[in-house]
A protein has these predicted regions:
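Class II aminoacyl-tRNA synthetase catalytic cores and aaRS-like
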Residues: 1-410
Length: 410
């Protein structure tokens, strides 16, 4: 039997004062986090988020990966950027005042932390990668999927202080294996959503097209900005599924960009070019990444073998001594969506890389133990889960694809 709705009644309903009225702008909607999921757009996005999460576990479990829970509180900085939330119990007492003065003066030492809960510096994790690597050496193929935190004071549409990361690690795998896994994973998640959330994707795509038309008609910049918030994404999703991803090295990418600039095919931000001109050794900016994916190849692009200067110490050094076995996947409509690498399994090279990047060798002694007591070639990647949901839904602001976004000042 199929149930049919004949009568619907709501209680305590006062439509005159409901703040999430039709046509409300996303910026205003974010002021009502507890109510915004009742709107059609946000409920579509959250159903897509659910499907992406389910597809993630299904993809890895079907391929024999083991799910590992990595710690939320950690002592190591995986990214080496230092933008971490510190965890301490010292601020509730008189010792806390002394601790804060020492912290501001840069004079904290081991004796200070002896009074703290963990007896040493502790932070909210920025990545589970280093921890999940320990299990790849025992369980072979593993992945972690959990919350991560960045104390990066960036109040933009691309950054969150709390977000979720998917980080698989494959034993006996090189960078090519890693790239194939990442491509298969992206295609799997998108295909799953296309199959199971077709109505949601089509609804969001139609809404985005209407907003794009309204932006085009707006007479001033303020009006265009008010109509923003969504991008028609259906064509980009179909491009991902259409065929193999384009592959190129970082050097080839730079050469292509320089050639197209010289030939007058593209012009990049003059202010950025003045500060940091396009050249070999420059970390690709978002405008470079999107140009390659959207204009040159019109499909996702896997860029490999980046200069070692702006990549992490754990990435395997190439024979040229200048580049590392790193990769980024650049997707049309969003730019970088996945970053990964083959890990450095040679102990002497790893220890030197830690020193070269002015990291504390003692902090990573346990990580070096993974090589010291036997290891295998392995690789992995990281994907910001909210970036994936953004890509599937077409939402332009990352704060609109997570139930309760955390960002500076929120």
């Amino acid at each position: 039997y199929k149930p049919y709705l004949s009568y619907l009644s709501t209680t305590n309903n006062n439509n005159n004062f409901f703040p999430c009225f039709p046509g409300i702008q996303f910026e205003t909607l974010r002021q009502h986090m507890h109510l915004r999921v009742r709107t059609t757009i946000m409920s579509c996005v959250m159903r897509l988020r659910n499907s992406c999460a389910y597809a993630t576990h299904r993809f890895f479990q079907q391929r024999g990966f083991s799910y590992v829970h990595t710690p939320i509180i950690t002592a190591s900085d995986c990214e080496g950027a230092g933008e971490m939330f510190q965890v301490t119990t010292l601020l509730d007492d008189e010792d806390g005042k002394k601790w804060e003065k020492l912290r501001k003066a840069g004079k904290l030492d081991a004796r200070t932390y002896k009074q703290d809960f963990f007896k040493k510096p502790a932070f909210m994790t920025v990545s589970g990668q280093l921890n999940v690597e320990t299990y790849a050496c025992a369980l072979c193929d593993v992945y972690t999927f959990g919350p991560t935190f960045r104390a990066e004071n960036s109040n933009t549409s691309r950054h969150l202080a709390e977000f979720w990361m998917i980080e698989p690690e494959i034993a006996f795998g090189d960078l090519d294996d890693n790239a194939h896994l990442a491509e298969d994973y992206l295609k799997y998640c998108i295909q799953y959503c296309m199959d199971n959330n077709k109505d949601d994707i089509e609804f969001l795509n139609e809404k985005a097209i209407k907003r794009e038309a309204a932006k085009a008609k707006a007479k001033d910049e303020k009006g265009r900005q008010a109509m923003g918030g969504m991008t028609p994404q259906l064509d980009n999703l179909k491009r991902v599924l259409a065929g193999p991803f384009q592959r190129m090295t970082y050097t080839e990418a730079i050469d292509k960009l320089l050639l197209d600039v010289k030939d007058g095919k593209v012009t990049f931000d003059p202010e950025e070019e003045k500060k940091d001109p396009l050249r070999w050794g420059l970390d690709l900016r978002s405008e470079h990444e999107r140009y390659l994916a959207e204009k040159v190849y019109r499909c996702p692009v896997i860029v490999t073998d980046y200069p070692k200067e702006f990549k992490a110490f754990y990435m395997r050094m190439n024979e040229d001594g200048k580049t590392v076995r790193a990769m980024d996947i650049l997707a049309p409509g969003i730019g970088e969506i996945i970053g990964g690498s083959q890990r450095e399994e040679r102990l002497d090279v790893l220890e030197q890389r830690i020193r070269d990047q002015d990291q504390d060798p003692e902090m990573y002694s346990w990580y070096c133990d993974l090589r010291r007591y036997g290891t295998v070639p392995h690789s992995g990647f990281g994907l910001g889960f909210e970036r994936l949901v953004q890509y599937v839904s077409g939402m332009e602001n990352i704060r609109d694809v997570i139930p309760f976004p955390r960002f500076p000042g929120s």
